[in-house]
C-alpha cells in the first residue's frame, strides 16, 4: 500500500518534469515497467520512442545548425542521443523512483542502472504519443532537449570512440576495425559484455567491458585509438 502511494507520487513528479499529464496512466506505468517485473514491459514502447527521439533531435539540430554537413549533424546528434545523456536526464527527473522492477533487479540497484533509465525515457516518449499524438510527443522531447541543443558546440564536441577510430584508420589508409563479443557475464537483466577490437593488419587487439554491447565497443574503440595515435601519429601539414 505504501509502495503504491510512493509510486503514484513519483509518477506525478515525473509528469511535471515531462511537461505532460497522462489521460491514461496505464501507458505511463507500462513505459516504466522493466521486463524483469512483468510480461507487459516497456521494450516495444522503446522501439517507438527511439524513433520519435531521433527524429525530433535531428530536426532540432537541422534548424539550429544550418551550415553543418550531414555527417557533422549525425555526430552531434550521437552526442545528445545516447544512453549516458538519457540516463542523466532520467536521474534529474527521478525516474528511478517510478520504475517497476523485478525483485532481483531491484536488489541489484536496477533503478540506478543507466541502460534501464535510458530505456524508460524512450518508452515514455512513445507513451505520450499513444496517449495523445506524435506532435505532442515531439513537444515533450523538444522541451527536455532544448537547453542541451542550445549548448551544443560542434567544434568542441568530442566524437564517439568508434567514429573517431574509423576516421583515424581511414586517414592512415587501413581497413576498418572488427568488433566481437568475447564474453557475456551475468544474467540477461544484469549483463557485462567483454568486446574485442581487432585492427587487422596492424596486429593490435584490445578488450573492454561495458554494461551493454555498444558501451563496451565504444571503450574498446577508445583504447585502440589511443594505441594507434601513439604508434602511428599523423604528420601535421605545413602551412
Swiss-Prot record:
Keywords: Cytoplasm, Endonuclease, Hydrolase, Magnesium, Metal-binding, mRNA processing, Nuclease, RNA-binding, rRNA processing, rRNA-binding, tRNA processing. One of its GO terms (molecular function) is double-stranded RNA binding. It comes from Neisseria gonorrhoeae (strain NCCP11945). InterPro entries: dsRBD_dom, RNase_III, RNase_III_dom, RNase_III_sf. Its EC number is 3.1.26.3. Mg(2+) binds at residues 46, 119, 122. Homodimer. Belongs to the ribonuclease III family. GO terms for cellular component: cytoplasm. HAMAP family: RNase_III. This is Ribonuclease 3.
Amino acid at each position: 500500500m505504501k509502495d503504491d502511494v510512493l509510486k503514484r507520487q513519483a509518477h506525478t513528479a515525473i509528469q511535471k518534469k515531462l511537461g505532460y499529464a497522462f489521460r491514461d496512466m496505464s501507458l505511463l506505468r507500462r513505459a516504466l515497467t522493466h521486463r524483469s517485473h512483468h510480461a507487459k514491459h516497456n521494450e516495444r514502447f522503446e522501439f517507438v520512442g527511439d524513433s520519435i527521439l531521433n527524429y525530433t533531435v535531428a530536426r532540432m539540430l537541422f534548424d539550429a545548425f544550418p551550415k553543418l554537413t550531414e555527417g557533422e549533424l549525425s555526430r552531434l546528434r550521437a552526442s545528445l542521443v545516447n544512453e549516458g545523456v538519457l540516463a542523466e536526464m532520467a536521474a534529474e527527473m527521478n525516474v528511478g523512483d517510478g520504475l517497476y522492477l523485478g525483485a532481483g533487479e531491484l536488489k541489484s540497484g536496477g533503478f540506478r542502472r543507466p541502460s534501464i533509465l535510458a530505456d524508460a525515457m524512450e518508452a515514455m516518449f512513445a507513451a505520450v504519443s499513444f496517449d495523445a499524438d506524435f506532435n505532442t510527443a515531439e513537444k515533450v522531447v523538444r522541451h527536455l532537449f532544448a537547453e542541451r541543443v542550445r549548448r551544443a558546440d560542434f567544434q568542441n564536441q568530442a566524437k564517439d570512440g568508434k567514429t573517431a577510430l574509423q576516421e583515424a584508420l581511414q586517414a592512415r589508409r587501413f581497413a576498418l576495425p572488427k568488433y566481437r563479443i568475447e564474453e557475456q557475464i551475468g544474467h540477461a537483466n544484469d549483463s557485462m559484455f567483454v568486446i574485442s577490437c581487432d585492427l587487422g593488419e596492424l596486429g593490435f587487439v584490445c578488450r573492454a567491458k561495458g554494461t551493454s554491447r555498444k558501451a563496451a565497443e565504444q571503450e574498446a574503440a577508445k583504447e585502440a585509438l589511443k594505441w594507434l595515435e601513439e604508434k602511428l601519429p599523423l604528420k601535421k601539414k605545413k602551412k
